[in-house]
């Protein structure tokens, strides 16, 4: 391709709407254009990157025996209602674009395809002899993001590889899961990215085992906790750890003390001369289920710890059946306005005790009449602790479970792990933190969808049983931008060789110099014929403009047919290091072959 023929416009200034470096650079370098909020066009350079990432993904998937297919983007609402996810995706998370056709039928634009693939399996798979089977697709997906941002990182449409496997037993499912773990690691290594595989929450997808693949980058939306020994890594939503040890309690006897102006843990510790580890704090949440019922949740947790909202949401989702519901639509700490709708009297905020009376809740069909009380494991074994008294300006000290307060029946792990905590696998190790961009996620779904949708097969014993499932996703367009977020400098993008739109750019400093044009043209032909993706900058522009654009666009290697031609040489500049060397024209092909082969190892 000749740049003089390509649709390419580069910008010198950062676009106003872009927040992170990769977003700014992809727009400035002419890779993408914003069409609407969270909607982008992939211009020729970007599509080449997408295609190269897709090729790597396909090769690794095919190597595992997975088969490529293409599933419909429009999905009937009935399928999602069967699985029980329609309300979750159109109301709770609200990320599915839904529409009504001219026959008054509800449809959704697919953010994911578990329901569709399960329906296909239900219709086609009859016997254990057909198992295991693994299908995947590369396709545009849609999400009605509340706040689209960061370009391709969080758009309303995106390109994704999603795969789904079906199995007769757990052993087979685990083998495919392990195969996908290996395949995903290979995809990211081959793409030239630094990454971590981390334990993750299954979220609305569901299932048991779940792992995310994070590209490490300072602008990553996700926080990762890991140990230096490489034996543990998890995202913040899923991470577990051992908190610091409890300090000896300074409270010998039970008492109620006046503690004015101590609504926070910090002020309480200062007033009572105690450690936050000696306190049981009680955090009030309001959960709204999909049947409209609100449940007031009181979480008792050690004073130096925070509640992990995702872990709490998972606990409440598991309890949905107790309230004749299927899922949680919303979870929040109720503000003053929310409290007015259900509070029978003013709450003693900042001084709430574990036994806050149920008579604080107004009688209503839409509100559960009793607090749902749960205690985090960090608070269970505290003795002689301090806590609220349910009276403003007063706290209880020297309290114990089973004496002054009944221990809640629901003992849970809802604490948020944090940097500096001790590792569970080795308490001598502490958790470190890093930022990451999620580009892949694999799940062991089990029978969640097959049971809900009646997808069964006949096993070796002649019994009809639900199919076991796994699902595996890679954000192709997100991975491409994540590569930029991980590798750039003040001059522009530094593409990994494997996914760069072109390996080489040949710059002609003076298009009026016939020797420069001739040598550049011959090299352009020779390199492309040898399988080296090469683009020729033959534009009628100043040399400085061409060099700046080459750095901005991020092509790994630049050949300049400049003054050194007088001695039969050209300049070779490596984008990642800016190192420049002069090589004779006859050695350009062999030199570049060696450099590219080395980079791809």
From Swiss-Prot:
Keywords: Aminoacyl-tRNA synthetase, ATP-binding, Cytoplasm, Ligase, Nucleotide-binding, Protein biosynthesis
Origin: domain of life: Bacteria
Coiled-coil intervals: none
BP terms from Gene Ontology: prolyl-tRNA aminoacylation
Molecular-function GO term, any one: proline-tRNA ligase activity
Listed EC numbers: 6.1.1.15
PROSITE patterns xref list: AA_TRNA_LIGASE_II
Annotated catalysed reactions: tRNA(Pro) + L-proline + ATP = L-prolyl-tRNA(Pro) + AMP + diphosphate
Enzyme category, top tier: ligase
GO CC annotation, single: cytosol
Main location: cytoplasm
CDD domains linked: ProRS-INS, ProRS_anticodon_short, ProRS_core_prok
Record localization: Cytoplasm
Subunit structure of this chain's protein: Homodimer.
Family as reported in the entry's similarity comment: Belongs to the class-II aminoacyl-tRNA synthetase family. ProS type 1 subfamily.
Its biological purpose: Catalyzes the attachment of proline to tRNA(Pro) in a two-step reaction: proline is first activated by ATP to form Pro-AMP and then transferred to the acceptor end of tRNA(Pro). As ProRS can inadvertently accommodate and process non-cognate amino acids such as alanine and cysteine, to avoid such errors it has two additional distinct editing activities against alanine. One activity is designated as 'pretransfer' editing and involves the tRNA(Pro)-independent hydrolysis of activated Ala-AMP.
Domain notes: Consists of three domains: the N-terminal catalytic domain, the editing domain and the C-terminal anticodon-binding domain.
Name this polypeptide is given: Proline--tRNA ligase
